[in-house]
Amino acid sequence: MTVNDYEDAKKLFEEVYDNTFVMYHEDSDSFAAEGLAVAMSYKIGGKTAKFKTIQGVKSSNVTLTQVYELHKNSLFTYVEKLGVLQTSEGKMLSGEYIDVVLGEYWIRFRMEERMQRLALTQDKIPYTNRGIGMLVGVAELVLSEAVAMGIVEEGQYRVDYKVREDVDSNEVALRKYNYILWTAMLQGAIHTGQISGILTYDIVNREEA
């Protein structure tokens, strides 16, 4: 959401919410956060919320101190840098990056959707290694799609599971299987960094004779 009064923004400094991000902009007609939400609805989880230009929104009249305070408390604003209008950060009030939260939801909901579709399109998912393999295959498919979305790094995910022989017979009788565990490395994004260099009068690359 967009907060238009800095004092109101300060009241949110102690709040911690995983699913809420707050932008400060003194212009009540800016709707900066709402515009960012629309931009982040495309290629979910695969792009950072920082550095984004929001059409029709002017730079916020904030001081460097205010920007520092906002960022310290996981809020952000809309500024101009190098002549380009852009969001100054991209975090939820919890401190987690917006793209990470969206990526987690994308994987979770897509996994549920694909598992449900599997159950609906098959006569049954047999409680055998073949049936377990069907579930594992769905999990691997969703994670491969998460790679294509830019959420997960290529080659950096795995799906662990128990084979039928290792499952207690009582659970088989209950038709319950809770042994698929996937692990994936977030692709992440670079937001800040330092480039170092040296100017010298010495020859750097000598030509071979």
Which role fits each region the language model picked out?
Residues M1-T121, V142-E145, V159-E165:
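A glycine- and small-residue-enriched flexible loop/hinge signal that marks low-structured segments
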Residues G90-A209:
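Structured, hydrophobic secondary-structure cores that serve as assembly/anchoring elements
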